[in-house]
Amino acid sequence: MNIGGEKVRSERLLLANVEDGKNMMSADSIRFLVLHCSATRRNQDYSVEQLRRDHKARGFYDIGYHFYIRKDGTMTQHRKLLEVGAHARPYNRCSIGICYEGGLNEEGRACNTITPQQFERIQELLAVLKKLFPKAKILGHRDLPGTTPKECPCCNASELFGK
């Protein structure tokens, strides 16, 4: 199977890995930088505390993303870089998860709501991550096979940030 032009193991083999909050094998195991949205309306705030509460309610021990970027561009880190996340099963052992606040318009429909501050912060973060993990592909959650029919991150991550 190919993702972003990269050959990966079968989805069945990826699913066999347990996502348990342990560390990944090495920096070389990072193959994807996955952009997510919080799937919240652009006119409503979604704090780190709300995100944490919602992720714990889903059975995660904490926030599943490595990074969360608020509408004002404030970024918080919630997992160590080589810690297995909980954001894109079955790809958690080979990816870094980045979530931006938003993704829905005022009516609750999928929409690219990335603010200029978020765009700048995401670009800065991805530039650093690409230096650390040069082989990693920048993709949206919806671009990973087996995760459809998701619309997340409600934009074309590869087109916006993959250059």
Predicted regions and their residues:
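Short Gly/aromatic-enriched secondary-structure transition segments
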Residues: S47-H55
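Basic/polar, cationic surfaces and motifs that engage anionic cell-wall
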Residues: M1-V34, S38, R42, K71-M75, ...
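Short solvent-exposed loop/turn micro-motifs enriched in small/polar/acidic residues
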Residues: F60-Y61
